[in-house]
Design a protein with these regions (language model features):
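Active-site-adjacent beta->alpha loops and helix N-cap segments on the catalytic face
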Residues: 2-3, 7-10, 31-33, 57-69, ...
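Short, well-ordered coil/turn segments that N-cap beta-strands
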Residues: 15-20, 45-48, 73-77, 102-104, ...
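Active-site mouth loops of central-metabolism enzymes
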Residues: 19-34, 55, 77-89, 164-179, ...
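Conserved, mostly hydrophobic/aromatic
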Residues: 23, 49, 98, 187, ...
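Catalytic beta/alpha-barrel core
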Residues: 49-59, 81-82, 108-109, 194-202, ...
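Active-site pocket-lining/capping segments in soluble small-molecule metabolic enzymes
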Residues: 130-159, 169, 173-174, 216-276, ...
Length: 314
């Protein structure tokens, strides 16, 4: 098997297996034990473990440090990098450091606006200056250049290439929806090897978006992993429906959660239905599963979905 980075995630996808990634959020402090506990809880349930980069613009342990802790625990991180907080010089420096640590998967993102950090009880940093020296498409291109040609974004050579399996995000149901597939195509053209979608709750709408991607030949050039967030309450679904761009939550799903005697178990049931639906959509090659502050549910869900054990010998 010819590989670009040699990561487990790359090998699983190229072997034709249905890949699984899950999310591990770093703590809002320096306690490595918080990451180690999650690593031990989730060991063996996925092919890659997304490590967020100051998600929702809330200050957390760096994605590089948390990714290294996962590596030390025997898990394969998918290190997220956002354009919000660094210019291209700092990004490339961090990418070199990540490569030196042995991190082999990088997910290139724009990053949540800093105003999102002031929510609930958190004051956040809504007045922080965003950077956006480059956008997420340019970030994909820059990482691809460092890997494929061993060059910096400015054209200067690197002493060695950085072997990364490069990921990007797709929000297929954000308006204008017909435009989104073309933005996806630009990311793939820039060098995105795999794609993780925003959370999907409307399978019919997502199937239409996937058909557009199939028709444009995108699914022949990259691997698309459908995103699923485990809903824990009707309030959580209602919040995402109203406040998370590109997340379409049918009213019927909110009503179902509202009427459930045990909302958490109903959320697990909904998650299993969504996973089964995603697997039936042509072009979907994997699952990106999130259980926000409920990671203990992931092994149970993946077992019930028939996605455990993960492929061996890869």
């Amino acid at each position: 098997m010819n590989t670009k980075a040699g990561s487990r995630l790359e090998k699983v996808l190229k072997a034709g297996e249905f890949a699984v990634t899950v999310e591990v959020g770093p703590p809002r402090g320096p306690n490595a034990g918080a990451i180690i506990d999650k690593a031990r809880l989730l060991s063996g349930v996925a092919d890659g473990y997304n490590v967020t980069d100051n998600q929702t613009a809330v200050v957390r342990m760096s994605s590089i440090a948390a990714s290294k802790i996962l590596l030390d625990e025997g898990l394969e991180p998918v290190m997220q990098m956002v354009c919000r907080d660094r210019n291209r010089i700092a990004m490339q420096s961090d990418l070199l450091g990540a490569s030196a640590f042995g991190i082999r998967n990088v997910l290139c993102l724009s990053g949540d606006h800093q105003k999102a950090s002031a929510s609930g009880k958190l004051k956040g940093h809504p007045g922080a200056k965003n950077v956006y020296d480059i956008d997420s498409i340019q970030l994909v291109s820059m990482v691809a250049g460092m890997r494929d040609r061993a060059v910096q974004e400015g054209g200067d050579p690197l002493t060695e290439p950085t072997p990364f399996w490069i990921g990007a995000a797709w929000t297929p149901l954000a308006p204008p929806t017909d435009f989104r597939v073309f933005r996806l195509a630009k990311k793939v053209q820039a060098g995105a090897d795999f794609i993780q979608t925003q959370a999907i709750f409307d399978l019919r709408a997502f199937a239409h978006a996937m058909q557009q991607a199939v028709d444009l030949g995108i699914t022949e050039k990259t691997f698309i992993l459908g995103g699923v967030i485990v809903p824990k309450s009707a309030a959580m679904l209602r919040y995402m429906q109203r406040n998370v761009p590109g997340v379409v939550v049918p009213d019927a799903l909110i009503d179902r959660m509202s009427q459930a005697k045990d909302p958490l178990q109903e959320g697990v049931a909904i998650t299993l239905e969504l996973i089964a639906g995603l697997r039936a959509i042509p072009g979907v090659k994997g699952l990106h599963l999130q259980a926000i502050e409920a990671e203990h549910l992931l092994p149970e869900i993946l077992q019930a979905a028939g996605l455990l054990p993960r492929p061996m010998g890869i």
